[in-house]
């Protein structure tokens, strides 16, 4: 029962997070929030119903049991990708038991160590309440959902409950050449109050090299996406949080992503800042890391910086990105350490919208030129020509 009551409380927390009035007001159904909220409510009810039903397996209702099982799987898609057995293995996950695995972790566990072929874990729609670890010994794994608004992995650890921010992620990826498509990663721990200690609640930690995320969602409040280390590519993703919600020391390109601040709504005219999109962890000039955001949109609630200098050589750029007035006029923060002004690299180029006004930006912010930008805006920034195979995506 413990698991079930946990899953119900997680589900309620998710619905609270996703159906928060401010989110609906700011981001209508175009962002799939209603769909997520509805489908996850539905999956929660299914989960509860299925569990309740489970108690009757010992009664003499075998025919209806079978009938119910068949009806659950009737809708199961028959068009799982064709098997190209030379190069790809397919594993199938469905929480209702309609294929080989009912949890994502059990499918990951079934992949052989150091497999040279691509292992596609096809995950049917639904909410999977579990922590998932993809170890270093398992490269070449793809998690393929059915849409970030209908397939998600969720858990609710915080830094306090999991012995630190580095271990509280719902999903931890250490294997290289990891790919995720059309799936959400969620940490549904309650949104922290300002000043809460140990409230960091990470949705995913990406610590393997050469990883790509396409059409994915990342949901949490504080420290949502731990872009820890390695070269990573994000395209058409939806990233939501409030404080330092994209953080780490990876070298990553974010293209065509929607970035949504969930920071508290401030009273009109308030100059307070209550969040930051990025906290990049580059700590020396010798580290070839940094975040590049190209053709993204930034909106949401509260008043946030584009980045704050978590480490002295923090490096982040925004190019051709649309920003609402959720971005504070100064744009960036040096972690209240003026000695970092000379070493951080924060730049903007060709951005638009009320939040992109450069006239009041902090003095250390660089107005980039076309030559500088050319090296930062496409997949060559992350050496994509060496590893990023669009056929895998």
UniProtKB/Swiss-Prot annotation:
It catalyses: [(1->4)-alpha-D-galacturonosyl methyl ester](n) + n H2O = [(1->4)-alpha-D-galacturonosyl](n) + n methanol + n H(+). Substrate binds at residues 165, 200, 308. The gene is PME8. Glycans are attached at residues 100, 113, 140, 156, 163, 182, 295, 350, 369, 378. It comes from Arabidopsis thaliana. Expressed in siliques. It is an enzyme of class 3 (hydrolase). Its EC number is 3.1.1.11. The active site is at 223 (proton donor), 244 (nucleophile). One of its GO terms (cellular component) is extracellular region. Pathway: Glycan metabolism; pectin degradation; 2-dehydro-3-deoxy-D-gluconate from pectin: step 1/5. This is Probable pectinesterase 8.
């Amino acid at each position: 029962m413990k698991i079930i009551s946990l899953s119900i409380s997680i589900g309620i927390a998710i619905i609270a997070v996703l159906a928060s009035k401010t989110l609906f007001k700011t981001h209508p159904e175009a962002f799939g929030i209603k769909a997520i909220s509805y489908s996850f409510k539905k999956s929660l009810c299914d989960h509860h119903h299925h569990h309740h039903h489970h108690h009757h397996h010992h009664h003499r209702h075998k025919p209806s049991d079978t009938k119910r099982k068949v009806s659950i799987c009737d809708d199961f898609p028959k068009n799982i990708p064709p098997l190209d057995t030379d190069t790809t293995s397919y594993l199938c996950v469905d929480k209702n038991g309609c294929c080989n695995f009912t949890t994502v972790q059990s499918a990951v566990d079934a992949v052989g160590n150091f497999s040279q072929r691509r292992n596609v874990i096809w995950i049917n729609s639904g909410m999977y309440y579990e922590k998932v670890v993809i170890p270093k010994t398992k490269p070449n794994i793809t998690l393929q959902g059915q849409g970030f608004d209908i397939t998600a992995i969720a858990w609710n650890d915080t830094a306090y409950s999991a012995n630190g921010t580095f271990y509280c992620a719902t999903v931890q990826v250490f294997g290289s050449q990891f790919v995720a498509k059309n799936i959400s990663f969620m940490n549904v721990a309650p949104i922290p109050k300002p000043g809460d200690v140990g409230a960091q609640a990470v949705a995913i930690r990406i610590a393997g090299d050469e990883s790509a995320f396409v059409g994915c969602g990342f949901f949490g409040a504080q420290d949502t996406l731990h872009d820890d280390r390695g070269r990573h590519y994000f395209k058409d993703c939806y990233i939501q949080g409030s404080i330092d919600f994209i953080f780490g020391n990876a070298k990553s390109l974010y293209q065509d992503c929607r970035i949504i601040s969930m920071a508290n709504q401030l009273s009109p005219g308030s100059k307070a800042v209550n969040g930051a999109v990025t906290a990049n962890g580059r700590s020396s000039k010798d580290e070839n890391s940094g975040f590049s955001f190209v053709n993204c949109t930034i909106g949401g609630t509260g008043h946030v910086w584009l980045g704050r200098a978590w480490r002295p050589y923090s490096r982040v750029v925004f190019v051709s990105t649309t920003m609402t007035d959720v971005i504070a006029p100064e744009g960036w923060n040096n972690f209240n350490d003026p000695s970092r002004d000379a070493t951080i690299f924060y730049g903007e180029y060709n951005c638009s919208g009320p939040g992109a006004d450069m006239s009041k930006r902090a003095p250390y912010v660089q107005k980039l030129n076309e030559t500088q930008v050319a090296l930062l805006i496409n997949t060559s920034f992350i050496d994509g020509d060496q590893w990023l195979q669009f056929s895998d995506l």
